[in-house]
A protein has these predicted regions:
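Flexible glycine/proline-enriched surface loops and loop-helix/loop-strand junctions
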Residues: 2, 62-66, 73-79, 110-118, ...
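Short, well-structured active-site flanking segments
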Residues: 22-45, 89, 144-148
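Structural recognition of the beta-strand scaffold that forms the well-ordered cores
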Residues: 9, 69, 81, 103-107, ...
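Mid-domain, small-residue-enriched loop/turn segments at the edges of structured enzyme/sensor domains
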Residues: 59, 80-142
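Structured C-terminal helix/loop/strand segments within mature extracytoplasmic catalytic/sensor domains
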Residues: 4, 84-85, 89-90, 132, ...
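Conserved catalytic neighborhood of penicillin-recognizing serine enzymes
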Residues: 42-81, 89
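Active-site SXXK
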Residues: 7-35, 70, 209
């Protein structure tokens, strides 16, 4: 089923992180670099531990911490703040395409998908292209080791999807992954139930995997 355009949902936060880290790498910006976030950027009625902690107030936060919120906690507001920092969703799409990844599309932010849930179908990838991107990010020198190591450490700390890729694996298996899922609509259909990442087995064997399920009932 690799020809299907699977909606990524929050898996696209991995693509966003790559573009952000590329900008930081090119401009030699440290992970502890502080960015100012306005209270108006912390949208209500969306999943956001960041907003729960800082509701109604401006804040200054390190870029590295914003990335942790977006990847490990799948914070939607943190993701959109990072999209803006990276230059917009169109720039992120072009960055990923320049890496040689073709069977995907990114055109929507978390806010635009929240306003019109059908737009979530516009952010899509094939499973094999997602695996290619994961492998490339792990094996190629896309940016300095300090950024690369931070990304994979953050992915191993993902708090969502303990019943997905990690499900029945031995407890000492290392899994660096990004999940993505939707609620079921009124007809009981779930747009997406996804998990993609790198798995390092206790014996040291490594593999990359993307599991995408769409429109399940």
């Amino acid at each position: 089923n690799n020809e299907v355009h699977y909606p990524l949902l929050s898996v696209f936060k991995f693509h966003v992180a790559l573009a952000v880290l590329d900008k930081m790498n090119r401009e030699e910006i440290p992970l502890k670099h502080i960015v100012h976030v306005k209270a108006s950027q912390l949208q209500p009625n969306t999943y956001s531990p960041l907003r729960q902690k800082h509701s109604g107030q401006d804040l200054d936060i390190p870029l590295g911490e914003l990335l942790q919120y977006s990847i490990s906690l799948s914070d939607n507001n943190a993701c959109d703040i990072l999209i803006e920092y990276a230059g917009g969703i169109g720039h992120i799409h072009q960055y990923i395409r320049k890496l040689g990844i073709n069977d995907f599309n990114l055109s929507e932010t978390e806010d635009s998908m929240h306003r019109n849930p059908q737009k979530a179908y516009a952010n899509w990838s094939t499973p094999s292209e997602m695996v290619r991107l994961l492998k490339m990010a792990d094996e190629k020198d896309l940016f300095a080791p300090v950024y690369r190591d931070f990304l994979w450490k953050t992915m191993t700390e993902t708090a969502t999807g303990s019943n997905k890729l990690k499900g029945l694996l031995p407890s000492n298996t290392v899994v660096g992954h990004k999940t993505g899922s939707s609620d079921r609509n009124l007809k009981g259909v779930k747009m997406a139930d996804n998990d993609a990442g790198v798995v390092i087995m206790p014996g040291g064997k490594k593999y990359y995997i993307a599991v995408f399920v769409t429109d399940s009932s």
